[in-house]
Amino acid sequence: MSNSGPILAMRDLHFCYEGHTVPVLQGVTLSIAPGERVGLVGCNGVGKSTLLKLLVGILSMQQGTLEVSGLAMKRENLASIRRKVGYIFQDSDSQLFMPTVAADVAFAAQNYGYPPEEVAARTRRALQQVHIEDCADRPVYRLSGGQKKLASIAGILTLDPALILMDEPSAALDPKNRRNLIEILRGLPCAMLIASHDLDFIYDTCTRVVLLHEGRVAADGPSERILQDGDLLARCDLELPLRFQRG
């Protein structure tokens, strides 16, 4: 695949959890271009988190094709794919386990075998990218919820990912940290797929929205068009973003 090709390409993706008769995902087709910020929205249980887990090999697809930077999703390609794709969990605490912020951010680059001087340089750069360089020597437990989210992102940025996946990144953030996160995400060069119930956050962060309903893609297009279509959102059991609600 050439450099101009999609970072992520999936076609006719299906997944059903063991013991269930109705698939969570039924024929999902989606591609993401380099640098594109895409919001993944839909009601509870529609398969947003499941889809993210399929993209990093936590779950295995049962039908369809999936490629990341031209690499097919196969066991032998998993290590290479995970180096290209960062995954931010909803609970940032699950990704932060070292004694200081700098140690946590450096962990991924160390784990991939970069020499110490390059690990240090990548760590400094990543901390600066998310504006928490002043927290480098701080114990993780002293960070706010927003700072923990940024530390998780910084750790992934040390590997220069082509794509970052995020599951409910604005959850539990106060307004200031929420605005800060939006600004930082909009300034990053990599592609993103952001799953969220917070449609205002998606509107501010993403240029494109993919709407899931009953395991399928119900709509895929510019954020401004989809997130202002009250009839479409209502058919998928969603409400308009707060900024577009009247009364």
For the regions a protein language model found, what residue spans apply to each?
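Conserved beta-strand-loop-alpha-helix hinge in the C-terminal portion
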Residues: R216-E239
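Conserved ABC transporter NBD signature motif
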Residues: G64-A72, I81
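Conserved ABC ATPase signature
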Residues: P139-L143, Q147
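Helix-to-loop junction immediately C-terminal to a conserved catalytic motif
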Residues: V56
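Conserved ABC ATPase "signature" region
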Residues: E117-C135
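H-loop/switch region of ABC-family ATPase nucleotide-binding domains
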Residues: S196-H197
